[in-house]
Regions:
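Active-site pocket-lining/capping segments in soluble small-molecule metabolic enzymes
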Residues: 2-123, 141-142, 150-264, 271-306
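As written
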Residues: 136-137
Length: 306
């Protein structure tokens, strides 16, 4: 028996990337105007390109979500709504939003416009999902920090809400007060009120060195008052990386997410190359199709994403 097939949602930083995403199996793309969608660089979408993209997507029977997940300050609110009006007129399948004020304004100005809650809203529990459901949000893009079990519990608690999950791409280390440093060094989570202000410690960098058995140890950062508590700093031919998370790659969990009834599997990467968009769409398309038809996961897909 075939399973419900989740939507494969790919990033689009350009019309070319959008077309390749669809050609290689994406069901939908997400894109936005640079100043409204947290992607100022490597984003060629203006109003004309947005209109063309939405038109092409619908002609193919695909979906196009317009990203509007910026958190505007007072002096940007009217400008945001002004620039959003023509986008709504283009007929995107939904707006991706994060700010409660923007959600309220969209409801006032554009009643009936579907809205998906951005990952920027940091939705990490089923109670928050129910809250946003009551506000008229049609889909929740869950926080990228959630594990499989947590996603499953949310699905069970709120079975009638569309859930979207990031399965591939870059992971942010911190976002406005949601720092990871304290949790990394001494397991005191700032998001639970236990921050130790690790950002204010005095650090020293210890150079890479060869240990007693001939293995190279990476550059590490050490707090002067806490000897032995080390944070690695990776280096390669391109430079040094501090607080650089490894990318998310959850292709091996596609079957589990499909069985849970997750509605959409999302790939990060609106600033990535068209090749990246095409390749990731191709691999995740195969993983979804295999999961839906009951085929065992093919481990070779892991290496195709290296």
């Amino acid at each position: 028996m075939s399973l419900f097939a989740p939507e494969l949602l790919s990033p689009a930083g350009s019309l070319r990337a959008m077309r390749l995403a669809f050609a290689y199996g994406a069901d939908a793309v997400y894109a936005g105007l640079p100043r409204m969608s947290l992607r100022v660089r490597n984003n060629s979408f203006d109003h004309e390109a947005m209109a063309q993209g939405i038109s092409e997507a619908h002609a193919l029977g695909k979906r196009f979500y317009a990203v509007t997940n910026v958190a505007p300050h007072n002096n940007k609110v009217r400008t945001l709504i002004k620039h959003l009006a023509p986008v709504v007129d283009m007929g995107p399948d939904a707006l991706i939003v994060s700010d409660p004020g923007v959600i309220w304004l969209v409801r006032q100005q554009f009643p009936g416009m579907p809205m998906h809650l951005s990952v920027q809203a940091n939705t990490v529990n089923w109670a928050a999902v129910k809250f946003w459901q009551e506000q008229g949000i049609e889909r929740i893009i869950l926080s990228r920090e959630l594990g499989i079990e947590e996603i499953g519990e949310i699905r069970e608690q709120v079975p009638d809400m569309e859930l979207e999950v990031f399965v591939h791409g870059a992971l942010c280390m911190a976002y406005s007060g949601r720092c990871m440093l304290s949790g990394y060094f001494n397991h005191r989570d700032p998001n639970q009120g236990a921050c130790t202000n690790a950002c204010r410690w005095k650090y020293e960098a210890r150079p890479a060195r060869e240990d007693e058995v001939g293995q190279w140890e990476p550059v590490v950062i050490e707090d002067k008052t806490r000897p032995g508590e080390l944070m690695p700093m990776d280096e390669d031919e391109h430079g040094s990386y501090i607080l650089n998370s490894k990318d998310l790659r959850a292709v091996e969990y596609v079957e589990q997410l499909t069985r849970m009834g997750v509605h959409s599997l999302k790939i990060e990467g609106r600033t990535k190359s068209p090749y990246y968009v095409a390749r990731t769409a191709q691999v995740y398309r195969r993983a979804i199709d295999d999961a839906v038809t009951g085929k065992a996961f093919d481990p070779s897909l892991l290496f195709e994403l290296e």
